[in-house]
């Protein structure tokens, strides 16, 4: 029983870390190093504890933060960099896949809704 507790704590610490550093280029291997685990093990543990893969979690987090920044009136290219996407096109593609509309459309909808 002890081990699950400590594992879970590691994941919680990593989630906190991600929440503060989601704008940086953080790979799973870097997180695994921080946690003192193998990448393969952390990958499985992350999915078990969080219920989604690391990449999907990070993407969801970044898009959530991006939506907030777009609502706050930042330009799409600014938001792209602020949430960790150096490639503007790539950010727009990911955002569209995720939200079913481009960041600009999302921004327009937010303003219309006010």
Regions found by a protein language model. Give the residues of each.
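Short hydrophobic/aromatic patch on the recognition helix
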Residues: 42, 46, 90-91, 95
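C-terminal accessory/binding modules appended to enzymatic or scaffolding proteins
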Residues: 24-39, 43, 48
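Residues within helix-turn-helix
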Residues: 29, 40, 75-78, 88-89, ...
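Terminal helix-turn-helix DNA-binding modules in bacterial transcription factors
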Residues: 12, 16, 20, 25, ...
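…primarily DNA-binding HTH/wHTH and HhH modules…
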Residues: 93-114
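Hydrophobic helix-rich structural segments at or within alpha/beta enzyme and signaling domains
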Residues: 1-4
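Short, structured helix-loop boundary elements
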Residues: 7-11, 28
């Amino acid at each position: 029983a002890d081990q699950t507790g400590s594992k879970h704590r590691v994941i919680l610490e990593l989630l906190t870390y991600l929440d503060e550093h989601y704008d940086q280029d953080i790979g799973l291997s870097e997180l695994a190093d921080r946690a003192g685990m193998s990448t393969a093990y952390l990958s499985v543990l992350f999915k078990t504890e969080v219920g989604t893969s690391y990449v999907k979690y990070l993407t969801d987090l970044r898009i959530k933060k991006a939506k907030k920044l777009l609502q706050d009136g930042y330009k799409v290219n600014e938001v792209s960099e602020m949430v960790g996407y150096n490639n503007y096109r790539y950010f727009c593609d990911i955002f569209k896949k995720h939200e079913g509309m481009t960041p600009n459309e999302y921004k327009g909808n937010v303003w219309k809704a006010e």
